[in-house]
Amino acid sequence: MRTIVITGGAKGIGRCLVEYFASQGDAVYFIDMDADAVATVTEKLCAKQMNVYGFTGDIADEQVLQKFAARVIEETPQGIHCLINNACLMKGGVLSGCSYDDFLYVQRVGVAAPYLLSKLFMHHFVGVGSIVNLSSTRAFQSQSDTEAYTAAKGGITALT
């Protein structure tokens, strides 16, 4: 059984990743800021006897990342096989008046959190381990009013 860690795992692509890896018999630890969605995914998959462990928190907050990583490391002495940095969000851009704070928030979720989680888990990977950073074509071509998201995807691409 492998141990997989996923950010943004309660909805969308992240939820599909959680469901897929859990269905393969892997232990999946995921984090998302939507408490209800975390509970729904965790309960649904645990009812099917899958090893899924949901954590509610905002990955833009360094303390949340520290606590999440500490929990995963404590509960997985055998190590981690894969970290999937999936979480990101849109807060608009220039046209919609995306504030400076909102722009920076998107960068913390989409770039800074993956960096810190990679650093926190660095010595806990099994064998060579894997870090998968999800990017987007937006990293190479922006679309109007998506500048915060585009910058985050450019940043995660540069980290990969």
Region locations from a protein language model:
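Canonical Rossmann dinucleotide-binding motif of NAD(H)/NADP(H)-dependent dehydrogenases/reductases
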Residues: M1-Y29
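Active-site helix of classical SDR
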Residues: S118, A152
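Conserved glycine-rich Rossmann-like NAD(P)H-binding loop of the short-chain dehydrogenase/reductase
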Residues: Q24-T40
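Substrate-binding pocket helix/loop in short-chain dehydrogenase/reductase
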Residues: V94-L95, S99-L104
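Conserved NAD(P)H cofactor-binding loop of Rossmann-fold oxidoreductase domains
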Residues: N86-K91
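Residue(s) in the substrate-gating loop at a strand-loop-helix junction
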Residues: S136
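Active-site loop-to-helix junction immediately N-terminal to the catalytic Tyr of the SDR YXXXK motif
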Residues: C98, S142-T150
